[in-house]
Amino acid sequence: DAFEELGELTVHDRTTPEEVVARCAGCEVVFTNKVILNAEIIDLLPDLKYIGVLATGTNVIDLEHASQKGICVTNIPGYSTDSVVQHILAFMLHFSSMVSIHNDAVHQEDWVNSKDFCFTLGTLNELSGSTLGIIGLGTIGRKLARVADAMGMKIIAAHQSSMNRLELPYELEWLPVDEVFARADFLSLNCPLTPETDKVVNGERLQKMKTSAIIVNTGRGTLVD
């Protein structure tokens, strides 16, 4: 209702790339989540003054071109920090304890048919004492580090000059990015997608990693080659 008080509001649950221009024609304000507004589309929307990205990542918008056209672009940082951290932790617990594998085995009656009361299909690894490497120590990365610290993990992060003087309530070791790859038992990608971070995980860096290491990418897909 608050939006409708400001002007005419039209909501489209889903929009294909072919429908974007027609649906946005004449609009001064456009809100989007996954729908891409690139330079070509922006040029076809001369009335557009504001783009609101209903997410944290802004890679669906050509930010440089929007700025050149005088179009304001905003996003929603920090709205899902706890959810993302919980999701990362779920993956880490899943792989360290082989949750789904044991769940499937129990449902297939492997445990009741086992000769041993203690039923395991392999080594279960504790998170405590293992090393978590973080690429991107922004809001999500810092919250993840807090949780990992509470679980007894060693935390290392890729060196960021802007973070050097940041006082953190946990012990963290700053390292060159290649060394983070080499030392991590778990590697969490929490950086935005930029020209510098595109394919930050590549063949050369994968060769540096432990064969047992796990990569959890809750950022953009092309952070990984």
Go through the PLM ranges and name each one.
Residues 141-142:
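N-terminal Rossmann-fold NAD(P) dinucleotide-binding loop
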Residues 1-27, 156:
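N-terminal glycine-/charge-rich "phosphate-binding" loop or analogous flexible N-terminal tail
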